[in-house]
Amino acid sequence: MSWRKRRKLPTTIQVHMLDDDRVEVFGRRMNMAQKILLQNTLQQTKRKQKYKIPNALALPLQKLAMDNKWEYEGIPVLLLQLKDQLRTRKLDPFHTDDKPHFTKLWKELHTHQQDGVAQIIQYYKGKALLADDMGLGKTHQGVAIALYYMMEGRVLVVCPSYLRFHWENALTEIGGIPPKDVLVIKKTEEKPICRFNIISYDMLPRDKCEVNKTKFSMLICDESHYVKNRKAKRTKAMMHIAKQCKRILFMTGTPALNRPIELFSQMHMIRPVFAKYSTHFAKRYCDGKMTDYGYDDRGHSCDEELNWLLKKVYMVRR
């Protein structure tokens, strides 16, 4: 049974122009977010008529984004309206009386680091890709964000094996966390029983790894370009953990090494609404096409659109 048969969606949406030039939308089976976005879209068109809109316009945003229906009878698609919804409010001051570790570290951060931490906490709600250049202090920002959310539950830090003890020192020395609350996992059978648990990428996909059986509140991935291959075992293991986490922070100085498809797995784990299916993502942003040797997703297309989407929805980069 097809998706459209399972969910009956309206083919006609009535649009009324009010006296004060406001737009009111009437459509069955539309949630409030879709109505608000559609009203904002039509507000700019100022067309006083009844629109015949395809079913795709009432579907979830990921369906919209991947159907290549970016305009219909002069109406911009809902995805493009996100730029009017995002980054419009000023960041509020922090209320961190109950977070002494975070408050202490916050005062020691540089201005650009404070700005990055504030964006990820207040704007991205703890789910973002921190892609600052090398030397700008991504580790300090990552520790600060981990301290802010530490009371929500266990935190898992995944990094290359040579950075495990670097993260241990960062949490204890920079973050002021007691050493008994930080665990560097050296064996697959070792259970992540501490508040902060650190494991390497190589150990994560092993069958007997206890980390895969544990639920975490926050996931931090340092050098996240290690999960660029969506078919690799480490990436699949990471996706399994990310589904259960409320906060996800990816950190890398090179978010995409060569091709846009290498961004898919990170975008899918952080916020899958715009990167739910790899084939749709490849068709839109990687010039995906079928060849004699199979499906080719090594190209690139709609570069400006992808760059805008990353800056507005996923990434902090200075």
Model-derived regions, located:
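Walker A/P-loop
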Residues: 125-145
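Conserved helix-turn-beta segment of the N-terminal RecA-like "Helicase ATP-binding" lobe
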Residues: 163-186, 270-274
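Walker B catalytic acidic pair
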Residues: 222-223
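Conserved P-loop NTPase motor "coupling/switch" region that bridges the ATPase
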Residues: 151-154, 218, 235-318
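Conserved Walker A/P-loop ATP-binding site and its immediately adjacent core
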Residues: 139-141, 152-173, 257-262
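Conserved helix/coil segment N-terminal to the catalytic DExD/H
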Residues: 188-218, 229
